[in-house]
């Protein structure tokens, strides 16, 4: 299972979803979906924007855990 960790970066930077939306041009509902892990897909360009803004690696934004029994 792939999980987004964007909400952790927002907390580290003391930034709101609205502020992130304003800084990146990414719609706030999209950012909310990333933070709530409810997006069905992740836009590669968004990852690039987040990594540049937060000066981090993709691994800091996404986590992969195998499902039980695999």
Predicted regions and their residues:
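DNA major-groove recognition helix of helix-turn-helix
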Residues: 10, 35, 42, 46, ...
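The alpha-helix within a helix-turn-helix
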Residues: 10, 21, 51
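DNA major-groove recognition helix of helix-turn-helix/homeodomain DNA-binding modules
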Residues: 45-60
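A short, Lys/Arg-rich alpha-helix, primarily the initiator
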Residues: 1-16
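Conserved hydrophobic/aromatic packing and binding residues within compact polymer-binding modules
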Residues: 20-21, 31-34, 61
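Recognition helix of helix-turn-helix/homeodomain-like DNA-binding domains
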Residues: 26-41
